[in-house]
Amino acid sequence: MTDPFSSPGSPSFDPYSPRLRTALVLTGTGTSGAYHAGALRALHEAGVKIDVVAGRGVGVVGALFAAIDGAQRLWDEKGFWRSKHVASLYGWRAAPRIVFAALALSVMIVAVPLLAVAVGLVVFPIDFVLKMVGAGAGGLTNAYVAFAQTAFAPEALPTWLPRLVLLVLGAAALMLAAAGWSAAQGRRVRGPFWWRVLRPPLSAVDAADYCWRVMWDQVRGATQLKQPTPVDLARRYTEMLADNLGQPGFRELLIAVHDLDSHRDLVFALVGESRRRDLFRRQTSDAADTRRAEVFDLAGASRDHLADAVAASLTIPLASDAHPITFAPDAYWRGETHRICDRPGSLVRLLEELIDLGVEQIVLVSAAPESRGPHELKAPRVDGRGRMGEYIQSADAAVVRDAIRIATARMSRIFVIRPGHNPIGPFDFQGGYDDRSDRRQPLGELLSRGYEDAYRQFIEPVVGASGDRVGQGMP
């Protein structure tokens, strides 16, 4: 097992074997998906056998495409992570933009009198210089004085400027109130009305829509058809995957999200027919009921919930609105509507589920680097998305370390692919600044780093070494 405090990607003490049931786990948030894409490309080129793909957070995107042998869509020149549309993901919601625009416009309006005074500071020196050279000012000073008297008359700027500021701020308040009212539709909410206006600052809707748009390009091929709704497309996806499990390139799929209302993690799984019963079979009825509350079979009646699972995985807790999921009336939750989102700690649950499904070795890919000790400090971020990203990346790194330590008690073959250094934060879709190299790094470099790390940390030292052992008759 990899020592969590050792260098990134150090191999497991137990040898890798291509004969064993293998799972690929992708975990992370935001731009981590680009790192996953690079690692997937390397694993694809090396022909690494993968039986199960599992995802948490943005790792669900890579897992979805890898499960149907479509991972090339992630790293192609016109693929998911090389498209210009990626730069607009997780943008600021309308409310923060309205507030900023209203405040900026109000400041500009209030600054008009100061601008008028500043013009006088320019006019008087010009008038003085013109008089000194004998050119004459042409009444420049007199014209400015007349303008100032007119502008600062009681019925002019002193009256209209406060009205304009009030109009701008009032319009912004009405827009925020309308946004809060529309967001409150659906489930009953508690608390004063004005708290509805203070919604999470980022929007995750575009990320889920973009995922399904690229998936539709993969599924439809060259045919020119209108894209169906995410629910319909998810249903087609699950049917295609269920019908082709066992065929080359098609793999079992696991997704983990968090339910805010039931206070538990939910697992959405599409596994082979021989393992579907293992998802729910337990020794006692109480344990079986718990499984029905937490585990959903995407090959059965829960196939329509795949779209919900993807949307929730791409939902950043606190930073974006939780995704609502409505369960079937005959399901365990009896038609209730719950709020679901991502949770970094659900990686632990994902590893436990994989082990219960008979997985014998795991390849874990994370873009969150492990701190190697002292002398690793960097300047903290002060921008809004940068501050949120720093916490998320730190939490992801800690969860990876804890999940590996917990899973070690049940499995010794866990191989980790992660960068030693990553200056691109989870929300830096246009690239990030690297203090160590004193330059900006585009998102494409993170994809390339995932490719290189997969070869350097896993394929060459682990998979290559296993081939030598197989040739010598070792397992």
Regions found by a protein language model. Give the residues of each.
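Patatin-like phospholipase
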Residues: 1-56, 64-475
